[in-house]
Amino acid sequence: MTPDPTHPHASPPAPDGIHYRACNLCEAICGLKITVQGGRVTDVRGDPDDPLSRGHICPKGAALPDLHADPDRLKTPMRRVGDHWEPMEWDAALDHVAAQLRAVREQHGADAVATFQGNPSVHNSGTLLSAGAFLKALGSRSRYTATSIDQLPHHFAGAEMFGHPLLLPIPDVDRTDFFLMMGANPLASNGSIMTAPGIRDRLKAIRARGGRVVLLDPRRTESAEYATDFHHIRPGTDALFLLALLNEVFASSLQRTAHLGGVMTGLDSLKAAAAPFTPEAVEARTGVSAGVTRELARAFAAAPRAAAYGRIGLSIQEFGGLCQWLVNALNAVTGHLDAVGGAMFPAPAFDLLAGAKAGATHHGRHHTRVRGLPEFDGELPNVALAEEILTPGDGQIRALITVAGNPVLSVPDGQALDRALGSLDFMVSIDPYLNETTRHAHVILPPAFGLEVPHYDVIFHHFAVRNTARYSQPVFPIRPDQRFDFQIFDGLVQRLTGRALATPEQRLSAGLTHGRSGLTLDDLKANPHGVDLGPLQPCLPGRLLTATGELHLAPAPMLADLPRLRATLDQPPEPLVLIGRRQLRSNNSWMHNTPRLMRGPDRCTVQLNPADAQGLEHGQTVLIRSRVGEITAPLEITDTVMPGVACLPHGFGHARGGTRLSTAARHAGASLNDLTDPTRIDALTGNAAVNGTPITVHAAEQVGESAAD
């Protein structure tokens, strides 16, 4: 779809020619070559000269022009008046929002104003480099983000083992010979907490050089096609399997700790912790045979260059924190941590750890009011948000600011949160769409985004498989009545504190100047394809930020959580549990409003193994029930999921009224999070345990034809 230049919402035309920038729609940050003719985008291709993505592009990157031209996108502030929306001028909108926030804060206290930041907050450098100052100006401890939906266990393990939440070991996939993946589907995600664009070719290259790619997952995913070995594993049992691997490593004296021996502490405690979890002890629970476990442990330990990696399937379960700790520990004790071809730490040009203090405390400094759940890195678990709004008393949340988030679809028990949002005294959303969450806002402040904004990937260079740097210039100018995200934050901060913010470009320039790469912002602007800073390099102990300067193999919180895990060995598995499903043409709840990404058959299907689908037929509508709710979805019978497992994609559920998402509404689907349970969490980290939700599946009652039919 191309914009009509006469339309009142049309953007100013872009200058004709070739434009280069990074796609910021997922973690792969692929370089793009964008052709503009007649003031509009006529072609989008992968940039072959980008040193990280090397010409790779996925369907999302090709759809960037469609997002830019989306007629449903908001560009000026909107105020809800009754059941309709009216436009506002920017100054009036910012004045009104600041006054409402100030009033709630003065009457109920700073913590009565909560914030929720969605994943796009870290995909946009303007927000990432400005939102922190806004949060500080609010002075509220009621901070919630998408982190505690799907990745908090990574950061918890990084803080406990290495001293900082952003110290996350990343697989050196381009030089490894044994890649062990668990609960990861990089063919759909393009790599997550592993920025690895073109992962298909990288996996094929491992096999081409004689290496192994081993994948364990409850579902035989798209990534399994590029694995040498695939094994089903029951949801929520990954920590048991990882302990069994460690058990075999220690029992067979396969540990290799010489290169980090003077840095690591807790080796004996880790060995003792793994002792009860023999491959035979866990095989009935995990579904992975003891023989397979022993062979994998021995082969992984013996490989000269190997990396273990666990992603979302390990994080969104009841033992996510233990899983991510054990992945790191396995790499460490086999000599594959901070080693070429193993799990390594990137060295980004703009380094968020540059000013970090060693020995800082990152969790448990305050707790939620209702359930007493601990904060981590200043954030509270999002499973508590609805109850903190709905439960009366001192500290009750009375106002909410959402930033690029749609928690009604992304947080467990979205129906409860939907009800909670309707009870707020005031809500403002910094978001370009009227979606399932922002429909509850009293004011929407839409920022410019995508092809209109300058961008540097601050976060994802910390997770990349190669050190590079790239600055993206805008393709399109914004209209006079539009605002960048940092201008919105600056306007609110000035009204709340009287102080102005530094611009993201100023902060980026300062960070680069003080970084180790020697690059300046001008250098990046002069190199539109990006700058190659080389492969990952060993960096320990210098990169560690623990109080003692050591790597902690057996942190006390992890050891204290092991009895909870051990108790599961005596518990029978649930008859049927639900897991999620990533899809290449979307990212969580994003991009369902883009027509070219929604083509083809219905993607919001529930997958069942034939053993669990007796009496049901492929394609029929089924009723799925959990403790908290029920939905209907078309049934897909497939042996790609193991028995006892149902699989449903997340991010759908666009049938709620009051939104302005015309394409998404035609592909509404059902929300997985109308089934997930906010009481199911990883007790160690507070992360939501959305995988493993017990459910039942039955044939839905016959429904009449819709009016459209």
Task: Annotate the PLM regions.
Residues T127-A205, R209-L216, A239-L243, A329-R439, ...:
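Extended redox/cofactor-interaction regions of prokaryotic respiratory oxidoreductases
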Residues G262-M264, F300, A343-A354, P504-S517:
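A glycine-rich phosphate-binding loop feature that marks nucleotide/adenosyl-phosphate handling sites
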Residues F116-H123, A284-V288, R311-E318, F350, ...:
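Conserved short loop/turn motifs at secondary-structure junctions
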Residues A93-V113, P169-F179, A273, R294-A307, ...:
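Glycine-rich phosphate/diphosphate-binding loops that line cofactor/substrate pockets in enzymes
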Residues T35-V41, A547-T548, S626-R627:
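Short acidic-glycine loop/turn motifs at beta-strand connectors
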Residues A227-H232, L451-V458, N467-I478:
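Short beta-alpha connecting loops at secondary-structure transitions
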Residues Q473-P528, R596-V606, D612-D709:
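Long, contiguous, secondary-structure-rich segments that constitute the structural scaffold
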Residues M1-S252, A281, S289, V403, ...:
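N-terminal export/assembly segments and adjacent metallocofactor-ligating motifs
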